[in-house]
Regions:
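Extracellular/periplasmic Venus flytrap/periplasmic-binding protein
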Residues: 1-41, 80-84
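Short beta->alpha linker loops
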Residues: 3, 27-30, 55, 109-113
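Flexible, glycine-rich phosphate/dinucleotide-binding loops
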Residues: 5-6, 57-59, 80, 169-171
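Extracytoplasmic/secreted proteins, especially bacterial periplasmic and envelope-associated proteins
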Residues: 7-10, 34, 55, 84, ...
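Residue-level signal for nonpolar/aromatic packing positions in well-ordered secondary structure
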Residues: 23, 35, 71, 93, ...
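Extracellular/periplasmic periplasmic-binding protein-like sensory domains
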Residues: 39-112
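Structural signal for conserved beta-strand scaffold positions within catalytic alpha/beta enzyme cores
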Residues: 52, 73, 164, 172-174
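Segments of small-molecule ligand-sensing domains
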Residues: 96-108, 112-172
């Protein structure tokens, strides 16, 4: 469907008419928020689950707790991730930025992780991007709240997690 639709009634009517058991969402930002709000208002969460790979914590807040019934998300990071690395990351984040810090999400976490990965490359003397793609050494260790690892030889071992929305937060239900 096109982006920036204000009225999702036609799409929601189709979902209801065909008796969909599940809806795969490929919307981001305001489009994801608007669609999920309308989905929730129409009570479609009682009959169809939703799966997205692009909803993060700030969008979840904007969707509204009352509109998250049976909303599942697959992502490489959730603030609710209960790994030792993420607990330490969140502690450092809140110690630095305080109680009013912006909500942690995959965008902020991946930026932080990217900086640490780049620092690891520089520590190995790899200062030019042309050197990076030819790097065939052993795995590169770097700080990762989601426990990602660069395995060497162009292999990135980044995990993917599944979570379910519970009101304004995600509950991680497993690693895929």
């Amino acid at each position: 469907m096109p982006l920036q639709i204000i009225d999702y009634s036609e799409q929601l009517a189709t979902i209801r008419r065909v008796g969909a058991d599940a809806v795969l969402l490929s919307l981001v930002g305001e489009d994801a928020v608007a669609f999920n709000r309308a989905f929730g208002v129409q009570g479609l969460g009682r009959s169809a689950l939703r799966l997205s790979c692009a909803i993060e914590e700030n969008e979840l807040l904007a969707i509204g707790a009352q509109n998250t019934e049976r909303l599942y998300v697959a992502s490489s990071y959730f603030a609710a991730l209960a790994t030792d690395a993420n607990i330490a990351f969140k502690e450092r984040y809140h110690n630095h930025f305080g109680d009013r810090a912006p909500t942690l999400n995959s965008l902020g976490q991946s930026t932080n992780e990217g900086v640490h990965f780049l620092a690891s490359l520089f520590e190995r003397g790899l200062f030019e991007p042309s050197q990076w793609k030819h790097e065939r050494r052993e795995p590169i260790a770097y700080r990762s709240a989601r426990e990602a690892v660069y395995g060497g030889d162009g292999i990135n071992l980044a995990p993917t997690y599944m979570a379910v929305a519970e009101g304004h937060v995600f509950r991680v239900i497993g690693r895929l």
